[in-house]
């Protein structure tokens, strides 16, 4: 989802 690009959200790289 769009949240995946934010820190701490999956694809953001962070948990």
Swiss-Prot record:
GO MF, one annotated term: dihydrolipoyllysine-residue acetyltransferase activity
EC number of this enzyme: 2.3.1.12
Alphabetically ordered keywords of this record: Acyltransferase, Lipoyl, Mitochondrion, Transferase
Chief localization: mitochondrion
Compartments where found: Mitochondrion matrix
Role this protein plays: The pyruvate dehydrogenase complex catalyzes the overall conversion of pyruvate to acetyl-CoA and CO(2). It contains multiple copies of three enzymatic components: pyruvate dehydrogenase (E1), dihydrolipoamide acetyltransferase (E2) and lipoamide dehydrogenase (E3).
UniProt subunit comment: Forms a 60-polypeptide structural core.
Protein name: 55 kDa dihydrolipoyllysine-residue acetyltransferase component of pyruvate dehydrogenase complex
Record lineage: Eukaryota, Viridiplantae, Streptophyta, Embryophyta, Tracheophyta
